[in-house]
């Protein structure tokens, strides 16, 4: 008998990992982290996967990381896309998109730990993340000499994980939060080539999380806009991802929203509703854009000039509790145009609310795309 497999590997090289024809994603496993690639051997020109994490501290300093395997990566830059973003409390921000030819995942079948490295052929530039299963922790390490270096860690908080809930973000995308609520530390240095200066983001009091998602159709073919946010305020943690489908697909709203209170998952909407809706039989998210720049909130720089959202989480069942929150754009993190009118905007969000009579306050990180 042969040796038992000690690890499984997914090694993507930009030159040969993209193939014609059909490819199938491996199945989602309820209750598990599902971090290892679902398309572990190849992707085609439609399928893709993303892993991302972000966090900020109470002052509004934060870092964000994105890792992507998609066919357009080869067309756009000749390598798998890695994004690193930083923001400081004074509004200064930093952005870098890398195109790296190799993306490697290794999972230990004994420990369940997963390490992913995105790198150049000679390994002179590399960005990696490691999931420590026993500790429920993600470590991100950046080694881009003369550009950015350092480490950020996301330690999962105790309590409900939400991993047993559905990952379906509409019919074509699966979305999960393997370490969805985390205490975060950062020790990163960023270089600014324009003036030759460097800035540090070093803290041990941040909050954030690590998400991953995968899909079988191109973003542009299924969505007209999207909004992502994770926020920590008092005893609450809010997690939202919502897609709005294209005109051809009926402008449907596809959300995966989660509300935690003191570590317990109290509301898990998989649908959006209207403020006056009656007879709600499922947890529901009511989400309304606002345009109140007179309050000092920022607006996006593209054709959608919203300054934030009003949110209501509605619990199904006899209790039918309602939690309401205001979300307002406080600090711009990034702003990237998409096409003639659309764009991708990121913000530090000021979030306030709770149950009736509560005024919990805190900060979050959001990303908003409009086409």
Curated annotation (Swiss-Prot):
Function: Diels-Alderase; part of the gene cluster that mediates the biosynthesis of varicidin A, an antifungal natural product containing a cis-octahydrodecalin core. The PKS module of pvhA together with the enoylreductase pvhC catalyze the formation of the polyketide unit which is then conjugated to L-isoleucine by the condensation domain of the NRPS module. Activity of the Dieckmann cyclase domain (RED) of pvhA results in release of an acyclic tetramate. The cytochrome P450 monooxygenase pvhE then catalyzes the oxidation of the C21 methyl group to a to carboxylate group.
Family named by the database record: Belongs to the Diels-Alderase family.
This protein's name: Diels-Alderase pvhB
UniProt xrefs under InterPro entries: DA_C
Alphabetical UniProt keywords: Isomerase
Lineage of source species: Eukaryota, Fungi, Dikarya, Ascomycota, Pezizomycotina
Alphabetical list of Pfam families matching this protein: DA_C, DA_N
Gene Ontology molecular functions: isomerase activity
Entry EC no(s): 5.5.1.-
């Amino acid at each position: 008998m042969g040796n038992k497999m000690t690890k499984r590997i997914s090694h993507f090289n930009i030159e040969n990992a993209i193939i014609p024809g059909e490819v199938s994603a491996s199945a989602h496993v309820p209750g598990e982290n599902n971090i290892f690639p679902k398309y572990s051997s190849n992707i085609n020109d439609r399928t893709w996967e993303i892993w991302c994490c972000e966090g900020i501290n109470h002052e509004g300093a934060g870092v964000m990381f994105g890792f992507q395997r998609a066919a357009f990566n080869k067309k756009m830059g000749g390598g798998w896309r890695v994004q690193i973003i930083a923001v400081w409390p004074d509004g200064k921000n930093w952005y870098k998109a890398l195109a790296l030819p190799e993306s490697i995942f290794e999972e230990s079948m004994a420990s369940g730990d997963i390490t992913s490295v995105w790198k150049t052929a000679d390994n002179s530039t590399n960005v990696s993340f490691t999931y420590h299963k026993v500790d429920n922790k993600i470590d991100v390490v950046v080694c881009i000499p003369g550009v950015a270096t350092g480490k950020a860690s996301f330690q999962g908080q105790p309590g409900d994980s939400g991993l047993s809930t559905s990952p379906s973000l509409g019919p074509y995308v699966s979305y999960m939060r393997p370490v969805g609520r985390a205490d975060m530390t950062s020790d990163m240095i960023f270089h600014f080539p324009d003036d030759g200066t460097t800035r540090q983001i070093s803290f041990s009091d941040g909050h954030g999380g690590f998400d991953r998602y995968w899909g079988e159709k191109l973003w542009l073919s299924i969505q007209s806009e999207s909004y992502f946010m994770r926020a920590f305020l008092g005893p609450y943690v809010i997690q939202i991802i919502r897609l709005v489908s294209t005109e051809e697909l009926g402008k449907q709203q596809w959300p995966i929203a989660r509300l935690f209170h003191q570590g317990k998952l109290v509301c898990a909407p998989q649908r959006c509703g209207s403020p006056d809706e009656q007879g709600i039989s499922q947890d529901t998210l009511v989400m309304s854009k606002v345009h109140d720049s007179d309050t000092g909130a920022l607006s996006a720089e593209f054709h959608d000039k919203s300054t934030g959202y009003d949110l209501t989480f509605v619990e199904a069942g006899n209790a039918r509790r309602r939690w309401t929150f205001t979300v307002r754009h406080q600090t711009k993190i990034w702003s990237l145009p998409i096409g003639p009118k659309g764009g991708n905007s990121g913000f530090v969000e000021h979030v306030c609310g709770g149950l009736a009579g509560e005024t919990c306050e805190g900060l979050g990180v959001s990303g908003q795309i409009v086409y």
